Design a protein with these regions (language model features):
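A general structural signal for well-ordered alpha-helical segments in protein cores
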Residues: 7, 26-27, 54-58, 70, ...
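Conserved Class I SAM-dependent methyltransferase catalytic core
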Residues: 210-273
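Conserved beta-strand segments of alpha/beta enzyme cores
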Residues: 83, 135, 159-161, 255-258
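Mobile active-site "lid"/loop adjacent to the S-adenosyl-L-methionine
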Residues: 184-215
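Conserved SAM/SAH cofactor-binding pocket of Class I
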Residues: 92-192, 218
Length: 276
């Protein structure tokens, strides 16, 4: 069995099962079995798979066909050009969340200290700490997620401290920038999620209460306690979350509250400036 034939067979199986991106998935799973970089698939199409490589590739395809996310099989997802370990305890970082990074770099490029609330893999805290050359603190309720985030920070040499607590309740600050991509799926929508999300990703990372915006109303007052005057609070929001999250900013000392949409044109990032 050559690389070329293995790719074709993997593609056929995944495409027949109706899975998204069958070619890319077959490539990623085969590379994982071969322990190679992507270029190898095209520079060595006649490479004969060893028995072990073939067995591993077959097992990965089988797991994917049963619904397991590719990133849970390879245990890695790229975010803003860097590899992040993922686990069943962490949300798989999404490309849409890179929009928050871009907005934070544009809006708060001078931040020296930042806080990421609900850090998961650490994707936001680590990326922003490295891009801004800032010191970061990141929180999560999940001990297992924080273990993964700590691993990622060490692997990427990012200056991030991790704290297990409810939102930012254990912290004193001050911070120049607070970011958060909290759970924001309304309870009624959980059943409608793709099975690969609903059945494999942690509900602690997904479920945002009845409306999906309640957690933002808890974060905003905490940010008021922690931000330096003039500092920014920047949220990722769900596609229906804008009005509810704007409401969270409405009664406090917030100015320059504004929304940006992602590449798909969906409301994605809402920010406000703490102006006491
Ligand atoms: C949507 S995920 C975002 C993860 C990561 N920031 C990202 O963008 O990929 C939300 C994260 O918030 C954490 N979380 C949920 N409720 C929390 C709470 N009350 N306090 C702290 N973290 C919480 C979850 O464990 C999860 O890691």
């Amino acid at each position: 069995m050559t690389v070329k034939t293995a790719l074709r067979q993997g593609y056929d199986l995944l495409a027949e099962a109706g899975l998204a991106e069958p070619r890319l998935t077959a490539e990623v799973l085969l590379l994982h079995a071969l322990h190679r970089e992507r270029i190898y698939l095209y520079s060595h199409p006649e490479h004969e798979l060893s028995t072990l490589e073939w067995l591993h590739y077959g097992r990965y395809l089988h797991e994917r066909l049963k619904g397991r996310p590719t990133q849970h099989i390879t245990r890695v997802q790229e975010f803003y050009g860097r590899p992040f370990r993922v686990s069943p305890a962490t949300l798989i970082p999404r490309p849409e969340t890179e929009h928050l990074v871009e907005q934070a770099l544009q809006t708060a490029g001078g931040a020296r200290t930042l806080l990421d609330i609900g850090t998961g893999t650490g994707a936001l805290a680590i990326t922003l700490a490295l891009e801004l050359r800032a010191r970061a603190v990141a929180t999560d309720l999940s001990f297992d997620a924080l273990q993964v985030a700590r691993h990622n920070a060490a692997a990427l040499a990012a200056p991030v401290d991790f704290v297990q607590c409810d939102l930012a309740s254990a912290l004193t600050g001050p911070f120049d920038l607070v970011v958060s991509n909290p759970p924001y799926i309304p309870a009624a929508e959980m059943a409608t999620l793709q099975p690969e999300v609903r059945d494999y990703e942690p509900h602690l990372a997904l479920l945002g209460g009845e409306q999906g915006t309640e957690i933002y109303h808890r974060i905003v007052p905490q940010a008021e306690r922690l931000l330096t005057p003039g500092g920014w609070l920047i949220f990722e929001i769900g596609y229906q979350g804008e009005a509810g999250v704007r409401g969270a900013f409405a009664h406090g000392p917030w100015q320059e509250v504004s929304l940006t949409c992602d590449l798909a044109g969906l409301p994605r990032v809402l920010r406000g400036r703490y102006t006491p």
